[in-house]
């Protein structure tokens, strides 16, 4: 019968009547890839099915959380069992403590943890904590790194050598933006200049240690270590946003992989097993300043929700099984390297960055090491590639600047099929 999407088109038209842009998160609208979105009916293992009956190999995995694949029976069973006891209590439960203990085992830099419900909550709360314990107001973020939609973080680089931020969204006051300095990822020398200029005013530096939101960009040798030394020298806190990389580039995240301990860490995605969970944590001396043990306020009605904790704990236990990460990394490398090889064979300009169970294929012929080089990608050509792959049953993120994620449910046969389809699509693009 071939690819059909009439029901998805009708569903999108209906959604546009009640949801801004027809979606509840902008990238889902498929605007950057030149088509309307598909509407999902169900997922199982490495596959999705849409409401038109099309089946896809899924490399989005709910934007990263589903490292075991869709509807893993153990995770689903844990959610069902928890739901039968009650969906929410707004009171302490033992499973919150169990989850926190597992996180702390995996991330030794996190001596205490506070559970929240979204990555945005985690980063906003970590920044408030950093400002509270240092008594300083300014923060540094990196261009191209995304940390949720908090006002302090919806900032892009302004003009001038000392790059004070300007808002990327209406509704963000310029007074808030002026407290955020935007640096360039992998540019340690530029960061040193910023610290020389105003280091005594900087509460924290926040970054994705491996970026995932301008596509996957890896830290250059010495960058993270230099950043750790620089923040210590000036008494600023180093915050790793590992919402995406935590439990994905290794069980202990990017900090475990690169052996760099931040002061605070933000987690999300995988730790919820597909349900809304995030966390922030770090050294005890800082976390004890969080209410109610300290004066720095943070709260949430659904924080530590028992269904989400059950899903997260079940996921982490399964990830501890022998060979899980070795298998994930091998499959990811085979897909990433296979795509690179096909592109080279066809004379097609693609640059691949890969780590752990995530990678990006940038439609450019130059190395991608920062935001500027990521932006050299041909987004129109990527859009054509995306559409071709979608119609062949391969569901990729609908943006050049998002990661490809693999799960334990993906098989070698899945990867073979994906590479076959990629070859056909790239050939058709010339």
Curated annotation (Swiss-Prot):
Protein keywords: Cytoplasm, Isomerase, Porphyrin biosynthesis, Pyridoxal phosphate
Cofactor(s) demanded: pyridoxal 5'-phosphate
Organism: Desulfitobacterium hafniense (strain DSM 10664 / DCB-2)
BP term (GO), one: protoporphyrinogen IX biosynthetic process
Pfam family, one: Aminotran_3
Modified residue annotations for N6-(pyridoxal phosphate)lysine: 269
Similarity field: Belongs to the class-III pyridoxal-phosphate-dependent aminotransferase family. HemL subfamily.
GO CC annotation terms, alphabetical: cytoplasm
Gene name per UniProt: hemL
Keyword Acetylation part of the UniProt annotation: no
Organism domain of life: Bacteria
Gene3D superfamilies assigned to the protein according to its UniProt record, in alphabetical order: Aspartate Aminotransferase, domain 1, Type I PLP-dependent aspartate aminotransferase-like (Major domain)
Main location (coarse class): cytoplasm
SUPFAM superfamilies given in the database record: PLP-dependent transferases
Protein name: Glutamate-1-semialdehyde 2,1-aminomutase
Catalysed conversion reaction: (S)-4-amino-5-oxopentanoate = 5-aminolevulinate
EC number assigned by the record: 5.4.3.8
HAMAP family per UniProt: HemL_aminotrans_3 (MF_00375)
Subunit structure: Homodimer.
Isomerase listed as a keyword: yes
Subcellular location: Cytoplasm
NCBIfam families assigned to the protein according to its UniProt record, in alphabetical order: hemL, PRK00062.1
